[in-house]
Amino acid sequence: QIQIFKALNSQIPQMGHLSLMTDIDGGGLSKRIGSLSIDELKKQNIEPQALTSYLAKIGSSQNVELHNSINQLINEFDINSFNKAPTKFDHEFLKNFNIKFFQLINFNTIKERITENKAYFTEEFWDFIKTNVSSIDQIHEWLDILYGNFYIDKNNNFETKNFYLNCFPDQPIDHLTWSKWLENITLKVNDKKINIIKNIRAFLTGKSSGPELSSLIIFLGKEKIFQRLK
């Protein structure tokens, strides 16, 4: 680069570089072998804010924290805080940090990016769902599960669904409804609670994991619960 500036009879700027970046095992990162690319990270739903926060601090003595703006990263940048030893790019850490991004991000910032069932994206919904999502696509998916055109398989485990339905407490839904419902079921059937919980979650959401069922059934409401169990 210096030779190019000399050949152009241009003033040579003051330059420097950070240490070599490797993968977590110490292997080289190369765009030629596709070991890492912005396009690949985008496909993995890594948020730009999470990525820039991570890249700005790895290899330095500063803690990796979620930034509010690029200007914040610029103001905090200190070349003297970086090590001379090779820096390891930890892909798993980045993915976990991306999950943390959704737990910390401001409600209004996220709401601007919601394009489906936006009327249902409330602060209450966001507090309910944010620890179970790691991408905007997953937020849209949960909005669809709760408020959209969620597909209900009426031909699957009819007897089990009907049994659970008959055990549902005959009272307005609140945060105690779930524990009462589960108690009603366990008193009448010899099955492990973990299996019952797994079945009900699958029947109501089509998922094997997700938010607490005690809150989920409140968001769903009795009408939708009954529809999905009939």
What is each of the regions a protein language model found here?
Residues K154-S209:
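C-terminal accessory/binding modules appended to enzymatic or scaffolding proteins
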Residues K6-I152, T205-K230:
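Catalytic adenosine-cofactor/nucleotide-binding cores of aminoacyl-tRNA synthetases and other
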